[in-house]
């Protein structure tokens, strides 16, 4: 069933509100319209393009929150963090991240994104990876966007260890998962 313009724009607004990192291409597929139609709808509704939406979300003073490493050392663009709870980053897979012969992302970039996010979520000036159990579930290609989500699973104050679960997605598909045992000072 094809939606009329007013209905489509209402759903577009709701979709972007609930999923701010959705691309125009994904929206076009979802609503069965052209990318240009999605862009025109966004303009009419004064909804910024994806990059601007990402920047807007990231302006939640991440610089003041992350203690364990400088933000420019986080692989990917960190867009949300709640220390000792959860964090999110986005990595746009570009030419420099892939093998030239097949445009498949090199695994160490996906690991680095997840590992740096596991470090960044720790509410401590000292956070080091003690152990990692990781799994790559599918190849990632050039041009894809990897959204990595870290969640603190447990914290052992006596041992100074925190377990952080990280899952990385392309769209809704898990492409990488890992459990990171993080060493931290025993003060927290």
From Swiss-Prot:
GO terms for biological process: fatty acid biosynthetic process; negative regulation of DNA-templated transcription; negative regulation of fatty acid biosynthetic process. Belongs to the FapR family. This is Transcription factor FapR. It comes from Bacillus pumilus (strain SAFR-032). Signal peptide: none annotated. Transcriptional factor involved in regulation of membrane lipid biosynthesis by repressing genes involved in fatty acid and phospholipid metabolism. GO terms for molecular function: DNA binding; DNA-binding transcription factor activity. Keywords: DNA-binding, Fatty acid biosynthesis, Fatty acid metabolism, Lipid biosynthesis, Lipid metabolism, Repressor, Transcription, Transcription regulation. InterPro entries: HotDog_dom_sf, Transcription_factor_FapR, WH-like_DNA-bd_sf. SUPFAM superfamilies: Thioesterase/thiol ester dehydrase-isomerase. The lineage of its organism: Bacteria, Bacillati, Bacillota, Bacilli, Bacillales.
